[in-house]
Amino acid sequence: MPVAARTPITQRLEQQILLLDGAYGTLFQSLDLTEADCRGALLAEHVTDIKGNHDALCLTRPEVVADAHRRYLRAGADVVKTNSFSATRLGQSEYRLEDRVVELNAAAARIARA
């Protein structure tokens, strides 16, 4: 790779091993969020249950997702992933949220960058 094309993360990887964050689903499950917690005001009237759809938290409870990122960073992670493991049309169809996939992914990226 030409020197000019190197990104800061590539430069860091050449010098050290970077630690990635952990499992978001496991972390969210440990919070014992209720259905109402998961829905928030945005999806309060949604037609199907969404508890267990941790990606939806990016829209309904972004502060919970941001806190998860902060927890991993405090624990020593160098890199955090977006909370978008199943933020695909197929993954969200179970919850009837497939029409919000773009919004989910944009929110997940926004939260991870913050």
Language-model-detected regions and their locations in the chain:
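Domain-level signal for soluble alpha/beta catalytic cores
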Residues: M1-A114
